[in-house]
């Protein structure tokens, strides 16, 4: 079985192998991001049942009246910045650099506030 992982692949044993053995794996930096006017999502890992992405918020909170309500749990880590997540029910959760939390499946939530420099890691998975 082969699975794509950001320019590499796993092979039966689960070992990571370069697609071209003459070339080393490509190293990328999580903190490299372009400032912009919109929130950007960069996939880092995409496996069956598991997706890891970088989110650069660029100060973009959820649109007025918009709520996330996802069928699978999501674990989020605020790598840099500050944010306020609003849960329905549950109220607000204030986050700062280094804070993480697990959002259970089917939990209505939104980003009420996020700083312009905010960078997240979001892990979506099937339980």
Provide a role label for each language-model segment.
Residues 48, 71, 91, 107, ...:
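A generic "binding-loop/recognition-motif" signal
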Residues 2-4, 8-11, 22:
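Acidic, Ala/Val/Gly-enriched low-complexity intrinsically disordered segments
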Residues 105-127:
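Ligand-binding loop in jelly-roll beta-barrel domains
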Residues 42-44, 63-70, 86-87, 93-94, ...:
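Short histidine-centered beta-strand/loop micro-motifs
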Residues 15-67:
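A short, N-terminal "cap"/entry segment at the start of jelly-roll beta-barrel domains
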Residues 51, 84-86, 110, 119:
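General beta-strand recognition
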């Amino acid at each position: 079985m082969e699975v794509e992982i950001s320019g590499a692949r796993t092979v039966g044993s689960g070992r990571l192998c370069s697609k071209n053995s003459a070339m080393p794996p490509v190293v990328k930096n999580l903190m490299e991001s372009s400032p912009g006017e919109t929130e950007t999502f960069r996939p880092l890992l995409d496996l069956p049942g598991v997706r890891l992405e970088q989110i650069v918020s660029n100060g973009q909170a959820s649109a007025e009246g918009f709520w996330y309500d996802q069928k699978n749990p999501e674990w989020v880590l605020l790598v840099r910045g500050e944010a306020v997540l609003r849960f329905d029910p549950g109220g607000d959760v204030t986050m700062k650099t280094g804070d993480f939390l697990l959002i259970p499946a089917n939990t209505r939530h939104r980003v009420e506030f996020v700083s312009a420099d905010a960078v997240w890691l979001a892990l979506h998975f099937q339980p």
